[in-house]
Amino acid sequence: MPALKSHVRPNSAAPARRQPWPCGSCVTAPVAVRIGAMGASPGPARRPHHRGCRA
């Protein structure tokens, strides 16, 4: 039943909760693009990498 799994989020969402803006490696993620479109993220050079990201 896919409906029961709707509340389960992938592990990749955990670091994003700790860091409110996307890092340089996560900039291509759909959520990161939405955050960047709202202008809530700093410049690409200022984005520290999430834990586990391939910097």
Swiss-Prot record:
Annotated segments matching region Disordered: 1-22
Name under which the protein is recorded: Uncharacterized 5.8 kDa protein in puhA 5'region
Organism of origin: Rhodobacter capsulatus
Organism phylogeny: Bacteria, Pseudomonadati, Pseudomonadota, Alphaproteobacteria, Rhodobacterales
